UniProtKB/Swiss-Prot annotation:
GO terms under cellular component: DNA-directed RNA polymerase complex
Membership in a protein family: Belongs to the RNA polymerase beta chain family.
Extent of the signal sequence: none
Gene name linked to the record: rpoB
A biological process from GO: DNA-templated transcription
Record-listed E.C. numbers: 2.7.7.6
Pfam families in UniProt: RNA_pol_Rpb2_1, RNA_pol_Rpb2_2, RNA_pol_Rpb2_3, RNA_pol_Rpb2_45, RNA_pol_Rpb2_6, RNA_pol_Rpb2_7
Function: DNA-dependent RNA polymerase catalyzes the transcription of DNA into RNA using the four ribonucleoside triphosphates as substrates.
Keywords from the UniProt entry: DNA-directed RNA polymerase, Nucleotidyltransferase, Transcription, Transferase
Primary enzyme class: transferase
Stated name of the protein: DNA-directed RNA polymerase subunit beta
Taxonomy of the source species: Bacteria, Pseudomonadati, Bacteroidota, Bacteroidia, Bacteroidales
InterPro entries xrefs: DNA-dir_RNA_pol_bsu_external_1, DNA-dir_RNA_pol_su2, DNA-dir_RNAP_su2_dom, DNA-dir_RNAP_su2_hyb_sf, RNA_pol_bsu_bac, RNA_pol_bsu_CS, RNA_pol_bsu_protrusion, RNA_pol_Rpb2_2
SUPFAM superfamilies xrefs: beta and beta-prime subunits of DNA dependent RNA-polymerase
Quaternary structure note: The RNAP catalytic core consists of 2 alpha, 1 beta, 1 beta' and 1 omega subunit. When a sigma factor is associated with the core the holoenzyme is formed, which can initiate transcription.
């Protein structure tokens, strides 16, 4: 922009051209966009997201396969309300989802049934705003991405208490039963289905086609086949027999129920498995008539110990496929199967049915990768090859030929983004809907019915609404400041449905892993029970299509770094495992070659020093290790990690100030964060500012001739600036323009500031003059001494907005009413109320003031006939109603800045005719506007096609509307219905076709907008505001509170250096410098050494001098060195390291020792004393114990606990203690008597029995013990 350039900072980074950041909100926006695929034509949509849900559930057939309901396409209409209307009215920002359905009949008997194609309404779906949030019931919410264990196969090892190593392989599918193969202490391998049913693994192998012992042994190449003859077997004496030698015969049995003769195969075991071949049993083998037998190979031939296989065969109760299938069925169902087919069907449906079992793209990819097999990616069910490969891998693992999986490795954990979570919810909803459709199809066999009759729209919306309203991953958005917003949207949680629980999560899951490098921030995570379970994405990290987190690296070939456009590639943790990676700040020459012969690098979890030729990749930037919040801390490399964690978390709690400063010492990420947070108004393209004032910016954008021609919109864009808009955390968004009339703007220019930003940069706090020195003991234990100037000049003043709501209901006794005429209330108390009973904008509010006046009918008794008559003659009596007004709570004081009143349309019979007239008029207006739009559309289309020949224009059913070769004359064009036509390939001329496609697309969008606008107007005329049932009106009052900094407020720097304001000192009493500059803050120097957050000293003693009028960027791990600091402090003419003699403000004398002085960045946090200050005399009591409730929200008391009782006992204060335990706590009779005595001025009565004693007695009686009080 010409007049307002963004802040230019002196950058200390050694890497001057780091890689551009991707959009910080891509994790939300891209995921939702891919879920809906609205910009993709139906025929080009990928099988993912919403399209995949429809593909999986359609077509739907009835039970006799007579009728088929087919899905063709889905689309959405514009939302009924704008974002601001949804927030103020408490509504959900959603769009109507509609689908094109086709119902046809395949039964020749129903020849008269016509195929029906209809647009069916499937209910509203919450729609993501452009800033990556959802508005649900007026509140902004974020769907947090979830980290969970990836589908696939996992190998693990554990040790039994007796010292035996146990091995297991677990297959985790996307959908379906879990199966686990595990060994026990007897070296037998079992298969566990769904962690419950246990069977020898060889039984499963028989059931899936490896019927005989021979098949199973051949699978692993354990045995060799030997011909049965004395001479041949003699060579193998002493070797183990691998498979049973059986003598089989057929026996005829009579079925007792039917009397039929049934043939059954019988077996006799001649020689069992694992018996040694000796002279004694050779004869038995020959007599059995066996042609061949299986002999175990020598250990030297095998190379591996396969005893687990032979041990498992010993435990196997089955001898054939049929027996195995029966055994598995019995294990799963606890009953015998009816027939072979049903037994076989159960096994198939468990692992081999696409409907019941799904490994997903990820599961198939992981299994193929892990086992080195090459099964088609489209095969999403288990195969026999999978099962055999897993068992073979497990045997190798037992023989130490393979290693177990590290479940905390990021190749074994993936991310469920918002799109995938919505896919799961829609899957549940559509499956339910499909069930009801099938039922309705079966019932309406001979009736004429349509897709609309079959589909119930509420099924899907109820599932989706419950997800957004109750799911642990749909969270109330943290909107304290722009950083809090963007961090919340980039958060990854291991908690939630299908994830871990904080009680059972161990240390390993929470710990930092080497694969987190560049993917998950090792610093930013909550303190407390969720530590390590909730993380943040690193600045450069992306989530790939499979849900794995990847990070970018530059390729290095022969010691030379590739700085070309194609030189950067994204690597998942798995792909990076065998690569050697150099640090981002390793010194390079101008050709990109490493200067040093020995380079520090990373290889897996090791940090070797290698030669440049051994390096495969290099970090794109030193910042890539950290998240956005951590990368905003300058000199982070000098801070202890624990304090950096606190610093990252506290920046999110910084309240937006009336006047914010961008930090003098920043890191260079501040501007990108503001741009991507979408909290400011950003230019959408090149253009000129036509008008600016405090609440509106108008910009006329430049457009090409073609774009202007195909558009139906004016190129003047109007932006309304939010003024004192309330956020979820009651902070305010108040934007100011930073452009001027006549300015040229380019795409991406930031046009406003405010809401913790200054001139397009993040500005969470203020730059203040700080001295590290004790001040009369007032900064003991991290307390902060503050200059009164901070209060007087509103340096740390913030505005907070509270919303107060009152509902007007329909009661049994009649309607409630908003009014300023309230019984038994003085005129003085209602002076600020308007006719509707709502307080006027601009009124000052104090505790106890009436905000909204409401009267509600009394419910004493039914009126007598006489009273009814008097009531009818003289109107309402004050006695009929009681005051139900909303009053200001004890801690509220502020100014009313906005009021709203939402009402349902209450039409009498007389009014209904007028409403019909309004609706008719609106319909006529809409038709007129649509006709005008179509006329303009035809005019543009005729001009565009210019009598060109048609290329064969088709509709969505692929029927030709305009035949190929026909001239596109005005007469031909006017007959086309644009809503039903395919918008591509009209004339064969690429440029014309592209413009036609844009023109039709813009026309349809504009037509939908007009229809939506008039639908909304009709809704307002007929129904009024959307309110819940039983509620007639909702009144809202917004009250702004201006909060200056005061004693008890919490403040912090960016390095985890937090403290409470302990004293506000007059400016003249603060320590001052030689030139008379007084300090703004005095901090305790003892807060630095033990906390090891030296970054604050570097920030302070660095360039932080206002004398230079310059700002700095010192990126983390690549910032200013001590030499740089010295250079700039010398330039500013201030002592190195900021050591300066200060003078006492009280006496004017110089202090003995020099103090460290400089300008540092301080924030005011959301923990303010006004919100925490609380006092109670009487209030609510707990129902059972009759003790006062706890906490400010419940207007509770202070708990006088066990240790406090000891203190009073130690002092011998018996009467005070008795009071505490009785009348001040739960002596119900005593406290009312004490209150009465205080009112009357009488002496205090003797305390009675506490209620908690009665509770104890009742509990003991409940155990059957009898007591009586004497």
């Amino acid at each position: 922009m010409s007049s307002h350039n963004p802040t230019q900072r002196v950058n200390f980074a050694s890497i001057k051209n780091p890689m551009e950041y991707a959009d910080f909100l891509d994790v939300q926006l891209k995921s939702f966009k891919d879920f809906l695929q609205l910009d993709t034509p139906p025929e080009k949509r990928k099988k993912e997201g919403l399209y995949k849900v429809f593909a999986e559930n359609f077509p739907i057939h009835d039970t006799r396969n007579n009728f088929v309901l087919e899905f063709l396409d889905y689309y959405i209409d514009p939302p009924r309300y704008t974002l601001d209307e949804c927030i103020s009215r408490g509504l959900t920002y959603n769009v109507p989802l509609k689908a094109k359905m086709k119902l046809y009949c395949t039964d020749p008997e129903h020849e008269d049934f016509e195929t029906v194609i209809q647009d069916v309404y499937l209910g509203p779906i919450p729609y993501m705003t452009e800033s990556g949030t959802f508005i649900i019931n007026g509140a902004e919410r974020v769907v947090v991405s979830q980290m969970h264990r990836s589908p696939g196969v996992f190998f693990s090892e554990s040790v039994h208490p007796n010292g035996t190593k146990l091995f297991s392989a677990r297959i985790i599918p996307f959908k379906g039963s879990w199966i686990e193969f595990a060994t026990d202490i007897n070296n037998v391998m079992y298969a566990y289905i769904d962690r419950k049913k246990k069977l020898p693994v060889t039984t499963l192998l028989r059931a899936i086609g490896f019927e005989t012992d021979k098949d199973i042994l051949n699978l692993f190449g354990i045995a060799e086949e030997v011909k049965v003859s004395k001479s041949t077997l003699k060579k193998y004496y002493g070797r183990k027999i691998a498979a049973r030698v059986l003598n089989s015969w057929i026996e005829d049995l009579v079925d007792e129920e039917t009397g039929e003769v049934v043939s059954m195969e019988r077996y006799d075991v001649i020689v069992d498995r694992d018996e040694l071949l000796t002279e004694d049993n050779v004869d038995q083998i020959i007599e059995s008539g066996a042609k061949n037998i299986l002999i175990t190979k020598d250990d030297s031939e095998l190379g591996l110990d396969y005893s687990v296989t032979t041990n498992t065969l010993q435990k196997d109760p089955s001898n054939s496929e049929k027996e195995a299938v029966y055994h598995i069925y019995k294990q799963l169902r606890n009953q015998d199967p009816v027939d072979d087919a049903s037994a076989r069907e159960v096994i198939n449906s468990l692992f081999f049915s696409e409907k019941r079992y799904d490994l997903g793209d990820v599961g198939r990819y992981r299994i193929n990768k892990k086992l080195g097999i090459n099964i088609d990616e489209e095969t999403k069910v288990l195969t026999t090859e999978d099962i055999t490969a897993i068992i073979a891998h497990l045997v190798e693992l037992m023989n130490s030929k393979q290693v177990v999986d590290d479940i905390d490795h990021l190749s074994n954990r993936r991310v469920r983004t918002v799109g995938e979570q919505l896919y799961n919810q829609f899957g549940i909803g559509l499956a339910r809907m499909a069930r009801t459709v099938r039922e309705r199809m079966n019932v309406r066999d001979n009736e004429v019915f349509t897709p609309i009759d079959l589909i119930n729209a509420k099924t899907i919306s109820s599932v989706v609404n419950s997800f957004f309203g109750t799911n642990a991953l749909s969270q109330f958005m943290d909107r304290t400041n722009p950083l809090a917003e963007i961090t919340h949207k980039r958060r990854l949680s291991s908690l939630g449905p299908g994830g871990l629980s904080r009680d059972r999560a161990g240390f390993e899951v929470r710990d930092v892993h080497y694969t987190h490098y560049g993917r998950l921030c090792p610093i930013e995570t909550p303190e407390g029970p969720n530590i390590g379970l909730i993380s943040s994405l690193c600045v450069y990290a992306k989530i790939n299509d499979l849900g794995f987190i990847s990070t970018p690296y530059r390729k290095v070939v022969d010691g030379k770094v590739d700085f070309s456009e194609n030189g950067v590639e994204y690597y998942t943790a798995e792909a990076e495992d065998d690569k050697t990676v150099a640090q981002g700040n390793a010194p390079l020459d101008e050709n990109g070659k490493f200067i040093k012969d020995a380079v520090y690098a990373r290889y897996g979890s090791d940090f070797p020093v290698v030669s440049p030729s051994e390096i495969d990749l290099m970090d794109v930037s030193p910042i890539q290790i950290a998240s956005i919040a951590a990368s905003l801390i300058p000199f982070l490399e000098h801070d202890d990690a624990n304090r950096a964690l606190m610093g990252s978390n506290m920046m999110r709690q910084a309240v937006p100030l009336i006047h914010s400063d961008a930090p003098i010492v920043g890191t260079g990420v501040e501007q990108k964060l503001v741009h991507d947070s979408r909290t400011q108004i950003v230019a959408e393209g090149a253009g000129t500012v036509e008008f600016v004032d405090a609440s509106v910016i108008k910009i006329r954008y430049d457009r090409s001739e073609d774009d202007t021609f195909v558009s139906f919109e004016d190129n003047l864009k109007i932006y309304n600036l939010p003024k004192f808009r309330k956020t979820n955390q009651s902070t305010t968004i108040d934007l100011r323009p930073i452009c001027r009339k006549g300015d040229r703007v380019e795409k991406g220019d930031i046009l406003t500031e405010g809401y913790s930003t200054e001139n397009g940069e993040l500005a969470l706090g203020r730059n203040v003059q700080v001295a590290y020195m004790p001040w009369k003991g007032y900064n003991y234990e991290d307390a902060i001494v503050l200059n009164e100037r901070m209060v007087r000049e509103d340096i740390f003043t913030s505005v907070h907005v509270d919303e107060y709501i009152l509902e007007v209901r329909e009661t049994k006794r009649g309607l409630e009413e908003l009014t300023s005429d309230i019984p038994n209330v003085s005129e003085e108390a209602t002076k600020d109320l308007d006719d509707r009973g709502i307080i006027r904008v601009g009124a000052r509010v104090h505790p106890g003031d009436i905000l909204i006046g409401k009267i509600t009918p009394k419910g004493e008794s039914d009126p007598t006939p006489e009273e009814k008559l008097l009531h009818a003659i003289f109107g309402d009596k004050a006695g009929d109603v009681k005051d139900a007004s909303l009053k200001a709570n004890p801690s509220l004081s502020g100014v009313v800045i906005k009021t709203h009143l939402f009402s349902k349309a209450m039409h009498s019979k007389k009014d209904k005719g007028g409403v019909r007239e309004i609706v008719k008029k609106l319909d006529e207006e809409m038709e007129e506007k649509l006709a005008e739009l179509r006329e303009l559309m035809l005019k543009k289309l005729i001009q565009l096609t210019d009598n060109k020949l048609s290329n064969g224009i088709r509709n969505f059913e692929d029927t030709e509307i305009v035949p190929k070769g026909v001239k596109l004359t005005p007469a031909v064009c006017s007959k086309i219905e644009f809503g039903e036509v395919a918008i591509f390939n009209w004339t064969g001329d690429e440029h014309t076709d592209e413009l036609v496609a844009k023109l039709i697309s813009n026309y349809l969008r504009k037509a939908k907008e007009i229809e939506s606008e008039y639908r909304r107007k009709k809704f307002d005329a007929t129904i009024g505001d959307e309110l819940p049932n039983g509620i007639i009106q909702i009144a809202k009052v917004l009250i702004a509170k201006k909060r200056k900094i005061q004693v008890g407020d919490k403040m912090a720097g960016r390095h985890g250096n937090k403290g409470i304001v302990s004293k506000i000192v007059r400016q003249e009493d603060m320590p001052f410098m030689e030139d008379g500059t007084p300090m703004d803050l005095c901090l305790n120097p003892l807060g630095v050494p033990s906390r090891m957050n030296l970054g604050q000293i570097f920030e302070l003693s660095s360039m932080g001098s206002r004398r230079l009028d310059v700002k700095f960027a010192t990126p983390i791990f690549d910032g200013a060195s001590l030499d740089d600091l010295d250079q700039w402090t010398d330039k500013a003419g201030i002592p190195r390291y900021g050591k300066t003699y200060l003078y006492d403000g009280g006496t004017g004398e110089q202090f003995d020792q020099p103090a460290t002085v400089g300008v540092t960045y301080f924030l005011k946090l959301g923990h303010m004393v006004d919100d925490k200050m609380h006092a109670r005399s009487i209030g609510p009591y707990s129902l059972i114990t009759q003790q006062p409730l706890g906490g400010k929200a419940q207007f509770g008391g202070q708990r006088f606990g066990e240790m406090e009782v000891w203190a009073l006992e130690a002092y011998g204060a018996a009467h005070v203690l008795q009071e505490m335990l009785t009348i001040k706590s739960d002596d119900v009779v005593g406290r009312s008597k004490a209150y009465e005595a205080i009112v009357k001025g009488a002496p205090m009565p003797t305390p009675g029995i506490p209620e908690s004693l009665n509770v104890l007695l009742h509990e003991l009686k409940g155990l059957g013990l009898s007591f009586c009080m004497e």
